[in-house]
Amino acid sequence: MANVDMQTFDKIIVLDFGSQYNQLITRRIREFGVYSELLSHKLTAAQIKEMNPKGIIFSGGPNSVYDDGAFQIDPEIFELGIPILGICYGMQLMAHNLSGGKVESADNKEYGKAIITVKNQENVMFKDLPETQTVWMSHGDLVTQVPEGFEVTATSDNCPISAMANDAKKFYGLQFHTEVRNTEYGNDILRHFAFDVCQARSNWSMDDFIDMQIQKIRETVGDKKVLLGLSGGVDSSVVGVLLHKAIGNQLTSIFVDHGLLRKGEAEQVMDSLGGKFGLNIIKVDAKERFLNKLAGVSDPEKKRKIIGNEFIRVFDDESAKLEGIEFLAQGTLYTDIIESGTDTAQTIKSHHNVGGLPEDVQFKLIEPLNTLFKDEVRELGEKLGMPHELVWRQPFPGPGLGIRVIGEITEEKLEIVRDSDLILREEIAKHGLDKEIWQYFTVLPGIRSVGVMGDGRTYDYTVGIRAVTSIDGMTADFAQIPWDVLQEISVRIVNEVDHVNRVVYDITSKPPATIEWE
């Protein structure tokens, strides 16, 4: 494998101002085959110049540019001669910093779909696109006067300056979010910026990522040993195969059966990763240990912290039996980082790979997937030669069924979720919907209700079905499963799973809900 020089790849950087959508921008750019990464808005112009990017994108964010403490930038960035695209807050920041621009609080705030009218279809950003377009707005402020040298290129009923452009300087602003799928021509607009404005080359691929990560892992680890916690999910499995490819037997994997796994999962992990790929796996039966720690705990954040901490404790116990372990590998993804919050984004919920680590953790962390989205992880798995059925398994959180049993966890509740989830997966696959639906699972909300079975009255649990369509997990719509399929699933669950007399279907999108219930 040849060493990979990052300077050979054209790059567009995204400066982070705190939008929950900001990492989607990097994802969209990468889809074009152009390398992109999300970086701090605190970077100086000199630091950016050293990186030699083809373009810069200012992300959206929750601030008002005119407020004290609002996220700002080094104004010298505008003097670098590098194309800049400002999205939402990024556009307002551009107007606020450049002479003649003005930003004010909007009389009518916009959150959701809106219709824009393109005023200049000759402008490079809207080239070959319709005059009217559906876009996704999410703003409380707006640009009321464009800076000197700019023209208004699009407008909407509630946002007279929906887009602006200075072709001479190659500065562009969009009040709407091109990175969100609800923006009809968002990808086309970003593509125009990447290729027509920035003149970037499409020379980045997953093969390059593999080469880079293997090189980075080897440089980081040296001759030391790495410990990996296998959860049974796609992410940790891909991390295991990638690390094994990079460092071979320097990797020891610990598979903790914490009693919170899906039906038959422990056996599948040992057979596929231990057998086919030859990973050195130590299996630990810690079911009683985890359930004792979780007894009486109902708060979802506390459950996540307990599970995350206990995983580390198990690793401590097992690593004490091993020599030379210095690193702990985790399957943290981009979406985990953003949902756990950064210095610019509020925490939605702590992720088990991010917020559950104790302060006295004994290992240095390796997180080779923390710049990838879920769909990229699946692509990576297939590039590594992993079985299709393993790579395309349903996403499964590190805390396992511990966050699919709402409230206090008991063995009876876990069995209900295991059995009902298996039925759901069987029926979805039987009806050929497993590739159409991005994620599907059952939850136990902890609700009991009255029912009638046979000649008797019952007072049993309700099972919830969650099924969503998505590209990367950042936004999601509930899957419109045919009614007859839902009926079959419901009938099977009520008849085959003990202590269940009602099945409900979650029809909430993300946002406002998250995909998991806890």
Curated annotation (Swiss-Prot):
Question: Could you tell me the superkingdom of the organism this chain comes from?
Answer: Bacteria
| InterPro entries, alphabetized | Class_I_gatase-like, GATASE, GMP_synth_C, GMP_synth_GATase, GMP_synthase, GMPS_ATP_PPase_dom, NAD/GMP_synthase, Rossmann-like_a/b/a_fold
According to its UniProt record, in which pathway does this protein act?
Answer: Purine metabolism; GMP biosynthesis; GMP from XMP (L-Gln route): step 1/1
Which keywords, in A-to-Z order, does the entry hold?
ATP-binding, Glutamine amidotransferase, GMP biosynthesis, Ligase, Nucleotide-binding, Purine biosynthesis
* All copies of domain GMPS ATP-PPase, residue ranges: 204-393
Q: Name one Pfam family in it.
A: NAD_synthase
Q: Which residues bind ATP?
A: S231, G232, G233, V234, D235, S236, S237
Q: Which residues form the Glutamine amidotransferase type-1 domain?
A: 11-203
* The EC number(s) this enzyme carries: 6.3.5.2
Q: What class of enzyme is it?
A: ligase
Enzyme active site: C88 (nucleophile), H177, E179
Ligase in keyword set: yes
Transmembrane spans: none
Ligase in keyword set:
yes
Q: Which GO terms describe its molecular function?
A: ATP binding; GMP synthase activity
Catalyses which reaction(s):
XMP + L-glutamine + ATP + H2O = GMP + L-glutamate + AMP + diphosphate + 2 H(+)
- GO terms under cellular component: cytosol
Q: How does it assemble?
A: Homodimer.
Q: What does this protein do?
A: Catalyzes the synthesis of GMP from XMP.
What name does UniProt use for this protein?
GMP synthase [glutamine-hydrolyzing]
* Organism for this UniProt entry: Ligilactobacillus salivarius (strain UCC118) (Lactobacillus salivarius)
